[in-house]
Regions:
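Conserved beta-strand segments of alpha/beta enzyme cores
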Residues: 29-31, 104, 146-148
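Catalytic His-Asp segment of secreted/periplasmic serine-dependent ester chemistry enzymes
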Residues: 118-191
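Surface-exposed cleft-lining segments at the edges of enzyme active sites
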Residues: 76-85, 113-127
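Short beta-strand elements of ligand-binding domains
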Residues: 106-109
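Tryptophan-centric aromatic hotspots in well-structured domains and transmembrane helices
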Residues: 68, 111-113, 185
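Conserved SGNH/GDSL esterase-like catalytic core that processes O-acyl groups on lipids
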Residues: 3-8, 12-92, 97-99
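Sec-exported extracytoplasmic/periplasmic mature domains
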Residues: 17, 76, 95-103, 139, ...
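Acidic helix-start/capping segments at beta-turn-to-alpha-helix junctions
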Residues: 34-40, 112-115, 152-157
Length: 191
């Protein structure tokens, strides 16, 4: 395997074993460090359990060595839309950490929630509004810090019918949705 990848994120990353799907698409070795509900800021903070695990992975398992190493980072499901400045700070720290370990940083930007979902109603915005804010917040953070950008918000917003993409909760991806996420990330890495 020529690629080694560290993926960090929450249940949107872990759902349906998406890192395994991506590993198969890229013929890569992927170490996934996930925690449900986690914010990206945790993963670059060595004082947190997840941050400590990230440092161990970068320092100790070979993910930092060799050609074609990536750190793929995913933030809390709504943070780019609801607190873009906190999102950008977290992306900046993760990009710095990746580069300190000779890895290319990749931002896996997530999507807006499905129209009518309970979590979207709680945020008080439409699916289109959330999708646009997710796209803008993540694009801005990736561009400001030189990260490769896998833009799932834009990809999902452009679907004529995105119902197949979502699990029943309207937030997480379905198995087919996770496969689409893996394919979109793979395309971004191959550019």
């Amino acid at each position: 395997m020529s690629l080694s990848i560290l993926m960090v994120g929450n249940s949107l990353t872990a759902a349906n074993a998406m890192p395994t799907m991506l590993a198969k698409l890229l013929d890569a070795q992927i170490v996934a460090i996930t925690r449900g509900g986690a914010r990206l800021a945790e993963f670059s903070n060595p004082l947190t359990k997840t941050g400590s695990r990230v440092l161990q992975a970068l320092d100790g398992d070979g993910t930092q060595a060799g050609h074609g190493c990536f750190v793929i980072a995913q933030d809390m499901s709504h943070l780019p839309a609801t607190n873009p400045s906190a999102h950008e700070r977290a992306v900046a720290k993760m990009c710095e950490l990746a580069r300190d370990h000779n890895a290319a940083p990749v931002l896996y930007g997530t999507w807006g929630y499905r129209e009518g979902s309970a979590k979207l109603k709680k945020l008080g915005m439409s699916a289109a509004q959330m999708g646009q804010l997710m796209h803008e917040g993540s694009l801005r953070a990736a561009a400001a810090h030189g990260a490769i950008f896998a833009d799932m918000a834009k990809a999902v917003a452009q679907m004529e019918d995105a119902d197949w993409f979502y699990a029943a909760d309207g937030v997480h991806p379905s198995p087919a949705g996770s496969q689409f996420v893996a394919q979109t990330i793979a395309v971004a890495l191959r550019r």
